[in-house]
Curated annotation (Swiss-Prot):
Pfam families: UxaC. Pathway: Carbohydrate metabolism; pentose and glucuronate interconversion. GO terms for molecular function: glucuronate isomerase activity. The gene is uxaC. Signal peptide: none annotated. It is an enzyme of class 5 (isomerase). It catalyses: D-glucuronate = D-fructuronate; aldehydo-D-galacturonate = keto-D-tagaturonate. Its EC number is 5.3.1.12. It comes from the Bacteria. It comes from Streptococcus agalactiae serotype Ia (strain ATCC 27591 / A909 / CDC SS700). Belongs to the metallo-dependent hydrolases superfamily. Uronate isomerase family. This is Uronate isomerase. InterPro entries: Metal_Hydrolase (IPR032466), Uronate_isomerase (IPR003766).
Length: 466
C-alpha cells in the first residue's frame, strides 16, 4: 500500500465514492489565527522556514520531544539548520498528525512527493525555496488556490480593524476576511486586566468605575466589530464555571483588582460567570456566533513561557470537576434571560465528548429554524487528530445530529494549514463509508453524499449567516 496518494485515509469503497462529492468543495474557515495584515500586504515568502515552521507550536513541541535544542527551534540557528532539525524529527513522527499534515502540505502545495528525511532535507530545502521564489508564493495565492471563501480571524477587542477594513475595500480579493471578538483580557485573572480596563476607557471615552460601566464600554466595542463585518466571538476558558453573585460584590471585586488585589478562585469564577453571561446577551443582540474553547491548561513550562511567551508548545489538556453541572446551569440561565446566542463549544479533553454533546442536546430548542443552534465543535488542538475527530463525531452522532455539524476549521497561524480541511474530509468520508459498508445506514450515496458536502462546507455557510 502506498502513502499519501489519491486514496490517502480513504479506507473503503464507500469512502472513495463519498470523497468524490466533497473533494472540490470550497472552504469556509470560520476560526483561525492568521494576521489580516499579512493577507492585505500579501508578503512574498522567500524562505520555507518562515512560511512552514515559524510560529508553528505543533512542530516546535514535536521537535523538543525529539531532543532538538531550542536554538534549532526558536533560537539563532540558521534556517537550513532548523529545517534539517525538523526533518530529523518528522522522519520519526509516525502516528502524529504533524506527519500527515506535513506530507500533504509538501505534496499538494509544493509538488514534493518524496518523504522528507534528514538525508534529503538539504536538497528539499533548496528546492522549496526555489519554488517559493519562482512561483511568488504569497498569502492571497495560497488562499485562492485552496478555494477559501471565508476567513474568521481572532482579534483583540481594542483592535482598530484597520486591515479588515482595507481587505473589505479591496475588490481584487474575493475572500471575506471577518474579525472575531476575543476578549480574554476582560477576565480578572488575566495579567493584563487592569491595563485593558485603562485602554478600554480611553478608546471608548468612558469612565469605567464599576461592572455596569465596564459592560457598557464592552458593548461599544462589540457594536464597532459588528459594524465592520464581525460574525463571531471567541473565548478560551480553563474550566466552565457557574457561580452567581450580585452587582455589589462585582463592583467591589472590580475596584479591588484594579488596585492590585489578587482574586481567589471563587472570585474568579463569579466574575467569569457574570461577564460571560453579559457578553452572551450582547452577542445575541448583535448576531455573533459565540465560540467557547475550554479545557486548556496553558504555559506549564514556566521557564519556556517566561522566555518565549504564550502559544509556544507547552500547553496541556485539562480536567475539571462538575463540568456538566456547571455547563447545564450556565446554559439554562442564559435561556431564562433570553440571552442564549448561537454557540460552538470546543472541548479539548476527549474524555468529556459524550458529556458535552449530551449537554448541548438539552438546549437546541429555537424558533428560528436553526439546525443545531448549539454546535459541538470539531476536535480542537490536541484532539485535532484522526482519533480525536472520530471521537467527536461519534459523540455528536450518538447524542445529537451529525448531519448538522459545521465541520472543520484550521484554528491555525499558518497559510499552509488548509490541507487540514482535506484531511478532515477524508476521515469524514471513511467514517460515513464504514456505516455504509457495515450496513448501519442505507446504501444511499445521494443522501450520504449530500450529508458529507453539508458537513464539509454548506452547514457552516448557513450557520454563520447573520
Amino acid at each position: 500500500m502506498t502513502f499519501n496518494t489519491e486514496t490517502f485515509m480513504l479506507k473503503n469503497q464507500a469512502a472513495l465514492q463519498l470523497y468524490e462529492e466533497v473533494k472540490r468543495q470550497p472552504i469556509f474557515d470560520y476560526h483561525c489565527h492568521l494576521d489580516p495584515k499579512d493577507i492585505f500586504e500579501d508578503r512574498i515568502f522567500d524562505n520555507i522556514v518562515d512560511l512552514w515552521l515559524g510560529g508553528d507550536h505543533y512542530k516546535w513541541r514535536l521537535m523538543r520531544a525529539n531532543g532538538i535544542s531550542e536554538a534549532e527551534i526558536t533560537g539563532p540557528a540558521s534556517n537550513l539548520e532548523k529545517f534539517k532539525a525538523f526533518a530529523r524529527t518528522l522522519e520519526r513522527a509516525y502516528g502524529n498528525p504533524v506527519y500527515h499534515w506535513s506530507a500533504m502540505e509538501l505534496k499538494n502545495v509544493f509538488g514534493v512527493n518524496e518523504i522528507l528525511t534528514e538525508s534529503n532535507a538539504e536538497e528539499i530545502y533548496h528546492r522549496l525555496n526555489h519554488f517559493l521564489k519562482e512561483h511568488k508564493i504569497n498569502p492571497r495565492r495560497l488562499i485562492a488556490d485552496s478555494k477559501v471563501m471565508f476567513i474568521g480571524t481572532t482579534d483583540h477587542p481594542l483592535d482598530t480593524l484597520e486591515w479588515h477594513k482595507k481587505l473589505a475595500a479591496d475588490e481584487s480579493f474575493k475572500t471575506v476576511v471577518a474579525p472575531t471578538f476575543r476578549p480574554d483580557e476582560a477576565f480578572i485573572e488575566h495579567r493584563h486586566f487592569v491595563d485593558f480596563i485603562t485602554k478600554l476607557g480611553d478608546i471608548t471615552q468612558k469612565e469605567i468605575t464599576d461592572f455596569s460601566t465596564f459592560i457598557a464600554a464592552m458593548e461599544e466595542r462589540i457594536a464597532y466589530f459588528a459594524q465592520n463585518g464581525c460574525r463571531a466571538s471567541d473565548i478560551s476558558f480553563t474550566e466552565i464555571v457557574f457561580e452567581q453573585t450580585d452587582e455589589l460584590e462585582l463592583n467591589d471585586l472590580f475596584n479591588k483588582v484594579c488596585e492590585g488585589y489578587i482574586p481567589n478562585q471563587s472570585e474568579i469564577s463569579k466574575w467569569q460567570t457574570a461577564v460571560f453571561m453579559e457578553l452572551c446577551r450582547l452577542y445575541k443582540k448583535y448576531g455573533f456566533v459565540t465560540q467557547v474553547h475550554f479545557g486548556a491548561l496553558r504555559n506549564n513550562h514556566s521557564t519556556i513561557f517566561e522566555k518565549l511567551g504564550a502559544d509556544v508548545g507547552v500547553d496541556s489538556l485539562g480536567d475539571q470537576v462538575a463540568l456538566t453541572v456547571n455547563m447545564n446551569s450556565l446554559l439554562d440561565s442564559l435561556v431564562k434571560k433570553d440571552s442564549l446566542p448561537k454557540m460552538i463549544w470546543y472541548n479539548l479533553n476527549p474524555a468529556y465528548n459524550i458529556a458535552v454533546a449530551n449537554t448541548l442536546a438539552n438546549f437546541q430548542a429555537n424558533e428560528l429554524g436553526v439546525r443545531s443552534y448549539l454546535q459541538f465543535g470539531a476536535g480542537w488542538w490536541f484532539a485535532d487528530t484522526k482519533l480525536g475527530m472520530i471521537s467527536q463525531m461519534n459523540a455528536l452522532a450518538e447524542q445529537g445530529m451529525l448531519a448538522n455539524f459545521i465541520g472543520m476549521l484550521t484554528d491555525s497561524r499558518s497559510f499552509l494549514s488548509y490541507q487540514r480541511h482535506d484531511y478532515f474530509r477524508r476521515i469524514l468520508c471513511t467514517y460515513l463509508g464504514e456505516w455504509i459498508e457495515e450496513g448501519e445506514v442505507p446504501e444511499d450515496y445521494q443522501a450520504l453524499g449530500s450529508m458529507a458536502k453539508d458537513i464539509a462546507y454548506q452547514n457552516a455557510v448557513n450557520y454563520f449567516k447573520n
